[in-house]
A protein has these predicted regions:
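Structural and coupling elements of P-loop NTPases
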Residues: 1-272
């Protein structure tokens, strides 16, 4: 999960209205802060008995950030709360009595405010408002022209083909483009044989992927999670560390070499 955060432009953190902020919620919040991901909050299951919007907003402000603002409230109340989160918003409130959408989008992008929405995903309550806010209060990142990508996942398809999942962070990645990188003390020069744009288990092959695209690439045999290609630097060590260790005891007659090969694949896919 942490590996994915490094390639997100924005995040929606879903919190149970019946449970409130839990330990894992705080962990996710720290990770989002570490990677500087602008975040919207959706407090779900508000249709259940005992879900108290006012109490939840107080908890969010105290445990996560004082910049959590209720966007389900009337616009006037929302803007008054926004005025406490930034000088530009305060100036707009004093001069015009309202905060512009552009100002709010800038504040969200700078993590100066965290919009909160309440509803029920099961009953589609509050979902439309959240989607509208994502459309209104998000900004398209400005990517550099210099080519760069960040690897965040390794997996294999149903046929066993090795997939390198990456985000293009600058320039354009083209199919069959040569990619040079260092791994395990050696330098490798390989080609991006296929660029796949996935939707569920289905994918569409691309000729090229522009900056901001997330694609799965075949043809890279030694890529690894956190690898930076081109102008992109290698990712820093993850914050989360495993707290449990496991021992695998093979049954009599098992092929240790085959087991090791499979374990190496698992290690690639989940290096933690």
């Amino acid at each position: 999960m942490e590996r994915t955060l490094s390639v997100l432009d924005y995040a929606v953190l879903v919190i149970s209205g019946s449970d409130g902020v839990q330990g894992h919620t705080r962990t996710l919040w720290r990770l989002l802060e570490r990677y500087g991901v602008p975040t919207f909050l959706f407090i779900n299951k508000m249709d259940l008995a005992g879900a108290d919007e006012s109490a939840l907003m107080t908890q969010l402000s105290r445990t996560l950030s004082a910049e959590c603002v209720d966007f389900s409230a009337p616009v006037s109340e929302r803007d008054e709360a926004l005025a406490l989160c930034g000088e530009t918003a305060l100036e707009q409130m004093l001069e015009h009595g309202a905060v512009t959408d552009a100002c709010i989008a800038d504040m969200v992008e700078q993590r100066a405010v965290f919009p909160c929405f309440f509803g029920s995903a099961l009953k589609m309550q509050g979902v439309e408002e959240l989607l509208a806010a994502l459309d209104t209060f998000t900004l398209e990142p400005d990517y550099p022209d210099a080519f760069g990508t960040r690897v965040f996942k390794i997996s294999r398809d149903a046929q066993g083909a090795r997939l390198t999942w990456l985000k293009v962070t600058g320039g354009t990645l083209r199919v069959k483009a040569p990619l040079t990188y260092d791994a395990q003390g050696k330098t490798y020069s390989e080609k991006a044989d296929q660029l796949r744009l996935y939707s569920g288990v289905k994918f569409r092959a691309l000729d090229e992927a522009g900056a901001g695209s997330v694609v799965a690439v075949t043809g890279l045999s030694h890529s690894y999670v956190g690898l930076g290609l081109g102008a992109e630097a290698e990712a820093s060590a993850p914050l989360l560390q495993p707290v449990l260790t496991y021992q695998l005891i093979l049954p009599d007659g098992a092929d240790a070499h085959s087991a090791l090969t499979k374990l190496r694949e698992l290690e690639e896919e989940d290096p933690m």
